[in-house]
Amino acid sequence: MSDDEHHFESSDAGASKTYPQQAGNIRKGGHIVIKGRPCKVVEVSTSKTGKHGHAKCHFVAIDIFTSKKLEDIVPSSHNCDVPHVNRVDYQLIDISEDGFVSLLTDNGSTKDDLKLPTDEALLTQLKNGFEEGKDIVVSVMSAMGEEQMCALKEVGPK
């Protein structure tokens, strides 16, 4: 036995933000990581195998948070990172002065770390509905450590 003390840093549970998937199996409507950003695939085209090398997949995708268009070309036999994308609905409790929202989770606790959406139409709809006293349920999309409000629906007046 040694007299050395070992210290291990504790961190998250080790759940990966992405999982591998073969490029040839990623379809339109699926998700992919391009340039480190989680994206939704809007177009896939495959080129045939040439004299040298593999068949290639050309992906055109939209960043799910910024809506920017990104493209990538990957050999169809290679693995690509696919983000774990989750969408959760929360009930809106309050909109704070500093640009954050207070949301009610399924288990009754509150979530106060989410900023107001950057999408102007969604922001206007959210503020107007809240001021009118309507019950609003917001959909929050999360992937790769980022979260953003992506949709809302009115459940009716209080």
Swiss-Prot record:
Residue numbers carrying Hypusine: 51
List of residues that carry Phosphoserine: 2
Single GO MF annotation: translation elongation factor activity
Keywords: Hypusine, Initiation factor, Phosphoprotein, Protein biosynthesis
Ranges of biased composition (kind: Basic and acidic residues): 1-10
Pfam families: eIF-5a (PF01287), IF5A-like_N (PF21485)
Region (Disordered): 1-23
GO CC terms of this entry: cytosol; mitochondrion
Tissue expression notes: Expressed in the vascular tissues of roots, stems and leaves. Localized in phloem companion cells rather than sieve-tube members. Not expressed in xylem or procambium. Detected in root tips and in the chalazal tissue of fertilized ovules.
Induction field: Up-regulated at post-transcriptional level by iron deficiency.
SMART domains cross-referenced by the UniProt entry: eIF-5a
A biological process term (GO) from this entry: positive regulation of translational elongation
Phenotype on disruption: No visible phenotype, but presence of extra root protoxylem cell files.
Domain of life: Eukaryota
Described function: Translation factor that promotes translation elongation and termination, particularly upon ribosome stalling at specific amino acid sequence contexts. Binds between the exit (E) and peptidyl (P) site of the ribosome and promotes rescue of stalled ribosome: specifically required for efficient translation of polyproline-containing peptides as well as other motifs that stall the ribosome. Acts as a ribosome quality control (RQC) cofactor by joining the RQC complex to facilitate peptidyl transfer during CAT tailing step.
Family: Belongs to the eIF-5A family.
Protein name: Eukaryotic translation initiation factor 5A-3
Lineage of origin: Eukaryota, Viridiplantae, Streptophyta, Embryophyta, Tracheophyta
